[in-house]
Amino acid sequence: MMKFGLLTAILDGWTYEEAVDIAAEMGFRCLEVACWPAGKAERRYAGVSHIDCARVLEDDDYARHVVDYAAGKGLTISSLAFYPNTMDPDLEKRTAAIDHLKTLIRASEKLGVGMVTTFIGRDQHKTREENYQLFDEIWPPIIHLAEECGVKVAIENCPMLFGADQWPGGQNLMCTPDIFRELFRRLPSPSFGLNFDPSHYVWQQMDYVKTVYEFKDKLFHVHFKDIKLYPEKLAECGVLAYPLDYMAPVIPGHGDVNWPA
């Protein structure tokens, strides 16, 4: 049965315990817990860390507290969340992202969570085909580790293309059904799937319902979000404009995703 939860990245500045408390008070049943490494955030909702995954691996008492505190409030942890660019053209940033993602996978096993939610990443200045080659180099060891740990890795389908900073290709390759098929073909694994967010289909003008049926066995986790497309703005700037020029993220029910479908 699907549980309705909360991504704790919106609670920047709150402790893990405070995030659990507020989620429980609001009636949520699970948490996707933000687990970025310590440091300055490079974008909104990034850089938040409610669980120290390196400490989880080293400190059994801390790991037990993380699980027990949530359980004591009637919550489970649906996933450990970290959304970096593992294919960043900056090799130092790329290596750091990959290393920390592997730490999350190991911590997810130890905590009994069994899920990590993240991005594939993308070198925004390279073609799709060149990024496929990067994927072949970077991702098999990550997924093989997940298999060994009994952890599922769920990739969110956000293109990470909003404005000039991500232009022209965006910073997350895995964002359309044809790319899903190609990457699942290149790396077939029961540990490799989707954290599906239909809102990103709205401004790309794709059929999210069809994707649910086609990739039903790969839907490990779902984001409940919405986007409003503004046709009058799109008619002025066209699809090659920055996406935020013709769409906006909104509260679910106020956008174009037909959630009851």
Outline where the language-model segments fall.
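Active-site acidic/histidine proton-transfer and metal-coordination neighborhood
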Residues: 18, 64-79, 85-193, 203, ...
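Histidine-acidic metal/acid-base catalytic patches
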Residues: 1-30, 35-39, 61-64, 71, ...
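A short, structure-level motif marking secondary-structure boundaries and short turns
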Residues: 3-6, 50-52, 88-90, 126-128, ...
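Short histidine/acidic/glycine/proline-rich micro-motifs that form metal-
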Residues: 10-11, 37, 52-54, 83-88, ...
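Alpha-helix boundary/capping detector
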Residues: 32, 49, 96-97, 133-135, ...
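Short glycine-enriched, charge-decorated loop/helix-capping segments at active-site entrances
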Residues: 48-56, 94, 169-170, 248-251
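Glycine-rich, proline-tolerant flexible connector loops at the mouths of alpha/beta enzymes
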Residues: 32-66, 126
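N-terminal small/glycine-rich loop or linker at the start of catalytic domains
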Residues: 1-7, 42, 77-88, 122, ...
